[in-house]
Amino acid sequence: MEDSTEDIIKSFTLEQSPEIKPKPKSKTSDLTDIVYAMDDDSIKMKKFTIFDDKYDQNVSDSEHDLTPIKRKRQQQPPPPQQPSKFSSSIPQKPTLSPKKLASSPTKNYTDHINQLRSGPNSPKKYQEDENVRSLKYEIKRLKQEQNLKLENLQNKIEYLTKERDELQDQLTSMSFENDKLAKKNRSLSHENNHLTLENSKLKTKEYSNEDLQLEKNKLQRMNNTLRSERDELVKDFNLTRDKLKKYYDLYLHCQKNHVNVKSQRTEVGGDKPTADNISTNEELVDILRKLSEMMIDQNKMSEPIAAIEKDKPSEDKTSSPNFDSSKDAPRIVSEFLEEFIKRIVEEMSANSKSAPSSKQHINSEMYSQPNNFSNNTMPPSQSAAYIPSNSQPAPRPAAAAAANIYSSSTPNTNGYNQSSHSNDRPNTFELPRVERDHWTDRPPSERSTQSTKYMKMDPEEIRKLVVIITDQLKKEENNEKSSNTLDSETPIEKCQCCHGNPRNVNEPTNQKLCQSCLNKGDFTMSEFMGHSN
């Protein structure tokens, strides 16, 4: 029997389960490997359940009770009671149980069976040992199964850890990309703000363009008004020139009517200078014609500049138009001619009421100094020494007063050096001799105030006018000298009185004009007005 049980146990010995190698993990792996391993373990467990069913039907596959089997003990019947009726009368001996010996069987059969079963070679003891062995095998199997499951779980944990690390790496990379996108978003927001600012600037620039357009229109209107004013000034200049021509015709008419008066003219300290009346008149006409032509040329020079400014694009006309000094020349000359005509009328009316003056006084005192009349506003071509006729001597204090008036200490501001050009000026004509009013004999309230009027003029305007006239005269003189060969039989007398320069009035040599200056035919404005009457 022992051999048979050992054969049975050997047939059901627990084989060592082969080691399960974990499959390589991948991102797509799942729990299928663990499920397959559990199925293999369940197949192996069926062998042990069959072995348990053979030897113990009370043990199930899922329940393994390691406690020993409890058996019911047979209760021995209590010893029979002796009848008590004999106790009082007859004493009884105590019952002695037989001595139990190992070799000798007991009288009770059940006890004997129990004794046999509890022995080391009893079948029950052998069965209990087999159960213990089976339990040990079961424990070993469960431990192996547990170790396998733990290994699978460990592999799964490692796989999940690796997956977690990969996800962590992806998370860090995504966080890095997120930071880059955040930076890009900030840069785009900054660029958006910049574009918004540029848009607002463009809107404001549109408004500023409208303002500039309005300003441009305003400047164009101003330019048109200035052009219209310039046209009016040119028109006034033409009218003034026509008036001057009329007054000059009147002067010629008066000169023809007073031809007989010219024969009565005498010269102090010499003979009567000879001069052709027709040539001198033509010379004055030429001077006035040259002056008018020069003004017309300046007007023509200013017109192309205005045309160029008109042809310029409107964008360049943002600033106010500027007129150069050449455009101001017609205005300056026009104002001067207007004042010149007014002065002609006033002095003609004043000279009509004049009385004869002293000849000696005029010759000796009045022309002892260069004429500073009107604060040097008249050009040198219109200043000359004049010797009136029918003059009578005047008292000395009046002559001294006249000398003080004409010997002004005001410097020469017209920019013209009379001494340097005294020998180059051509001989001017001789005017008819008429009676002249000596205005110094009148009280100051009745004297003419043209000099103070011209003293109020701007010296710059006077200088411009004088320079223009003198330059034109010098050009004409040079042309005449080069074209016409004049007879120079009589030598030209040089100026000995320092005409046109500041002098000391107290010097006796500077009290009179030299013969050269007298022969030039220079005359003052007052004398010219007196002859034109």
UniProtKB/Swiss-Prot annotation:
One of its GO terms (cellular component) is cytoplasm. Its main location: cytoplasm. It is found in: Cytoplasm, Cytoskeleton, Microtubule organizing center, Spindle pole body. The keyword Coiled coil applies. The keyword Transport does not apply. Residues 103-121, 349-392, 405-421 have a biased composition (Polar residues). GO terms for biological process: mitotic spindle pole body organization. Residues 1-32, 53-130, 309-329, 349-453 are annotated as: Disordered. Keywords: Coiled coil, Cytoplasm, Cytoskeleton. Residues 83-94 have a biased composition (Low complexity). Plays a role in mitotic spindle pole body organization, possibly at the point of spindle pole body separation. Required for mitotic exit. It comes from the Eukaryota. Residues 136-236 form a coiled coil. Transmembrane segments: none annotated. Residues 18-30, 53-68, 309-318, 432-445 have a biased composition (Basic and acidic residues). This is Spindle pole body protein CSA6. It comes from Candida dubliniensis (strain CD36 / ATCC MYA-646 / CBS 7987 / NCPF 3949 / NRRL Y-17841).
